[in-house]
Amino acid sequence: HHPGLIFPLKDYHAIAIDHCHKSYMEKYYPHLQQVAFLPIGATQSRLADVIPYEKRQIPLLFLGTYESKDGMLEKFRALCRKTFADPKIRQEFYDLGMALLEVMLAGKESANGERVEIPMEEALAGIVDQEKLQAGAYGTRDFAVLMNYLYLIDKYVRNARRHKVLSYVADLKVPLTLVGEGWEKVPL
């Protein structure tokens, strides 16, 4: 969404779908007059009664966009080729993307010893070389622009986590209905 948010328009408002998204936009796009929070996902309608689990026609409905890992990595390679003409910058950017992918997939240890997700912003801040960033080695000097360039890595990680949850549910033999673009690509 970065290309649409960078312009310092007068009276510019945005809507965020979660609190982290809201904080992110407020931090990196201070020219926005207001960022409103609109909780869309997993929100219960006040107009309808909750159907008891045993009476539901669809026991578990899983919504999402599903893509193949190889396809997403190829899209990232294509983005590198398209965005960076200089082979050195292209390789620096690709290597940074792969390092980010590893860090995000590995997660981090929480205070109670469990593995938890690392948000892209935190993971990238931990691995990006600030001197290289300020020198433009990754094709930009702006951290928000760099994160936008790397959106496919974040998408890859979210997709991998989605597949992991689906595999877990399938292993439990819970009846599952998948809905969303690319659902047929899910190998269950």
Show the residue positions of the predicted features.
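A conserved, positively charged/aromatic
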Residues: G4-I15, Y28-P30
